[in-house]
A protein has these predicted regions:
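Gram-negative bacterial Sec-dependent N-terminal signal peptides
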Residues: 1-5
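Start-of-domain marker
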Residues: 6-72, 83-85
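Second-shell loop/turn segments in exported
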Residues: 17-24, 111-119, 229-230
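Acidic/His-rich structured neighborhood in mature extracellular/periplasmic domains
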Residues: 69-182
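Alpha-helical segments in soluble extracytoplasmic regions
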Residues: 158-224
């Protein structure tokens, strides 16, 4: 399912092929409910024109039935932003959340309150809505996503008292807790500046002249490399490169040998 909504244009798919005991109709109802939750709710304070709404997709794959209304799943979350002067969309987030466990009964309303943890499903969906908006805003203005990352962090803090996985530091090294914690950690501030430089000063300027923008992209990669050396294997850096790997190959295919050499030194 997809449509234009308030802030997000989110395609939602629920894949329940592995589930045999539950009526498949329940998962179509769930898909519709999530679609409406993501697309019709007002997540930001800004007014979006239809063509400005943030492109994203959530693919939820049900892996196990724990009971008649409790399911274990994983969710693939992807978001993109347009590149000025082109019809190309650049990926900002590409993450598979392997701890997407939730309760759902058919036609159960998806209730959510910013100030209170009501269910793991709506907490996870709201978390990703705010992360998607925060990343988008960071790509258009320096640290422009602060407000939305703080909202995502509030959800993490509220959900950490639940017994659901992915909200706590000891649940693993690649989860919801660590992603927003990395983003708001001052030692990773350079990465957020690099995201702005990469997109707004790099990609968005390439319609006019590729020479200067590609040097800015290379400087952004240098910042990421420096951060990775001081804080190796951080989730923030890993997710940046998982989103950008194919794009970087395309960008540097037309770069000068010297620029390619610099980029390779930062990427290896």
């Amino acid at each position: 399912l997809s449509m234009f909504g308030q802030d997000l244009n989110c395609v939602v798919t629920v894949n329940a092929e592995k589930v045999t005991q539950t009526d498949p109709k329940i998962f179509k109802t769930l898909e519709t409910s999530i679609f409406e939750f993501m697309n019709t709710r007002k997540w930001s304070d800004d007014i979006f024109k239809p063509e400005e709404r943030i492109e994203c997709q959530i693919l939820i794959t049900i892996t196990e039935e724990l009971s008649s209304d409790k399911f274990k799943a994983q969710a693939s979350v992807v978001s993109r932003r347009p590149v000025y002067g082109s019809d190309y969309n650049s990926t900002l987030l590409n993450f598979v959340d392997k701890d997407f466990e939730f309760n759902y009964a058919e036609y159960q309303p998806l209730e959510y309150n910013d100030n209170q943890y009501t269910s793991n499903l709506t907490a996870m969906l709201a978390y990703y809505a705010y992360m998607i908006i925060g990343l988008d805003y960071d790509s258009f203005a320096q640290k422009g996503g602060d407000k939305y990352f703080l909202k995502a962090q509030t959800i993490v803090n509220q959900a950490s008292n639940s017994d659901s996985k992915g909200w706590k530091s000891f649940d693993g090294t690649r989860n919801r807790y660590w992603y927003v914690t990395n983003i708001l950690d001052p030692k990773f501030a350079g990465i957020r500046d690099a995201i702005y430089q990469y997109h707004r000063q790099g990609l968005d300027q390439m319609y006019n002249d590729q020479t200067k923008p590609i040097t800015i992209v290379t400087k952004a990669l240098q910042t990421l490399d420096n951060t990775n050396r001081t804080s190796p294997n951080s989730m923030f850096v890993q997710l940046f490169f998982s989103a950008k790997s194919d794009e970087l190959l395309g960008l540097y295919s037309k770069a000068t040998p010297a620029e390619k050499s610099k980029a390779v030194s930062y990427l290896t």
